Amino acid sequence: LNPYAFHFEEIKKITKGKLQKIVLASILQSDFVYNYEYEPVADFPVYDSLLERYGKEIPNPEVLVATRSKIDIKKHQRAITATGQPAPDFLLADSSGKTYSLKDFAGKTVYIDAWASWCGPCIAELPDYKKLVDKFKDRQAVIFVSVSIDDTKTAWIEKGLNKHHPPGLQLWAGKGGWRSTFAKNYYISGVPQYMLVDGEGKIIDFNAPRPSSGEKIGNAIAEALKKKELGPAYFKM
């Protein structure tokens, strides 16, 4: 019995009537949407089956319709951000106003860090981020790009750059923060978020390991560089 199916059946045993419907609806609206965002795509048929089975027990059809809509969005997001898909291009400026496009980094492995000056977890990652950048300082084939989603350029510079001195190339997503084109195209729903893109502009990992993962992210970058050096034909042998 699938853990979620077991969970649902247990809830049905210990709750009744209106309370049961409320609890089941709550799980569908929260846990299920989360699964479609973070769990393996291969597991989607299982969750589809559970949604079909237990969704019928939700008395309010609007809840089920809204949940299905959210899930459809997540499925689409996962499809276009899957490994091998082209990463969305961007045109963003650094603190001096010089603009950069993802295409400018063609041929290089790109580690993208979406962050904000007000984000505690983002700041907590900086010591390890600096170590990661330093580890690959002699490798010209990798570049570290941080994109701030601070609402204003002033906040980004004064509270972010000047205060914390983050490493790598520092860019600003532009006005709007969460509503900026970058945030929308990269589906930034929380920060920090890290992404790894190969030299052809294709996604390696849209939810790459954090700098604090240590060897995990170090090995991921090293593997990407190795593939670039040996060429794709080598890995098809």
Where are these regions (language model features)?
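Structural microenvironment flanking redox-active thiols in thiol-disulfide oxidoreductases
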Residues: 124-163, 177-183
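Short beta-strand segments
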Residues: 113, 144-148, 172
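Conserved redox-active cysteine motifs that mediate thiol-disulfide chemistry
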Residues: 106-107, 113-131
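Alpha/beta-hydrolase fold active-site loops
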Residues: 109-110, 192
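Short, internal strand/loop/helix patches
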Residues: 6, 88-93, 157-199
